[in-house]
């Protein structure tokens, strides 16, 4: 019997199962207690129970398997992992573990892991010899994530324009700079849809920090990938814990040579949360930012890299500007030079309902010659020279008309020849 299968069932289905297994007072129990009772019942019959989760190692040496469905929140149905298992299999925070579990004995509160079957989808022996993420060699991105698709929908235009103006590669550290109400969340959704459609082998994680609950639900329903969230009514410590879990999980996957993409909305709110959490150093920068507060969000953002030994970690993070808060401007200024790709959104275009509201002259990718073939690069440069003297609004409208008139970017380049 699988713990995660029970978690996905509705309460009414669990109650029916409990009644058929003759558990007393089933309809008065909470969902967690129902799962507990059912699993205990199975264990009494001598059946094995299996569980899975993402490991969080606590300072005391032991750890727990947290569930991605609850965004790694500590709960009563977490699975305890003993220090000896962690040492034996060389486990770290962020490892995804599957294995056999047992019900709590007297005086225990949690399920316990008995046998480790898989670590990050592979046999546990394999993870002993992997190179740690910190020791891998970072390189410039050399392989592009194509965001253009074979559909004639509105959202394909977003992907095609990003492919032209600031292409995203495997291992890109991209900053999406956006004033409020400029369509950044929708743009992230479009990027997520394009990546899941064109690159199914990539592991996609959408991390929503300090977002509105209805946007979280919309993301979960529209994106085929893992959506991890911490809404704006949660404390700052929770934002920080979620972000740490996600980045550790991503690092473990990169060590197994996987391509991981994290879409973060937004790094500004994450930096604010860290600013609340860090102990006061006594030095305060403009806008009330503590001098040490930005080191950890920079470590999060700086983890994005293309790895020579195989695998890559791509992070597309949104940074808020023009919110009227000095702190947000300071945070943006600190992150400005750290990314190797920038996408600037424009408030004026969004107010005129031109989407994607991309500012062409200010957006771009460093070393894009490594991502884009040489013949296309010449054309893109010609296009930029043509669009430079125009007003930002006119340039975007002109580019959109030309893109809507052609079926694909290749056709668009061919039409430029004429």
Curated annotation (Swiss-Prot):
Its EC number is 3.6.4.-. Keywords: ATP-binding, Helicase, Hydrolase, Nucleotide-binding, RNA-binding, Transcription, Transcription regulation, Transcription termination. It is an enzyme of class 3 (hydrolase). GO terms for biological process: DNA-templated transcription termination. Pfam families: ATP-synt_ab (PF00006), Rho_N (PF07498), Rho_RNA_bind (PF07497). It comes from the Bacteria. The keyword Coiled coil does not apply. GO terms for molecular function: ATP binding; ATP hydrolysis activity; ATP-dependent activity, acting on RNA; helicase activity; RNA binding. One of its GO terms (cellular component) is cytosol. The keyword Transcription regulation applies. Facilitates transcription termination by a mechanism that involves Rho binding to the nascent RNA, activation of Rho's RNA-dependent ATPase activity, and release of the mRNA from the DNA template. NCBIfam families: PRK09376.1 (NF006886), rho (TIGR00767). Homohexamer. The homohexamer assembles into an open ring structure. Belongs to the Rho family. This is Transcription termination factor Rho. It comes from Chromobacterium violaceum (strain ATCC 12472 / DSM 30191 / JCM 1249 / CCUG 213 / NBRC 12614 / NCIMB 9131 / NCTC 9757 / MK). The lineage of its organism: Bacteria, Pseudomonadati, Pseudomonadota, Betaproteobacteria, Neisseriales.
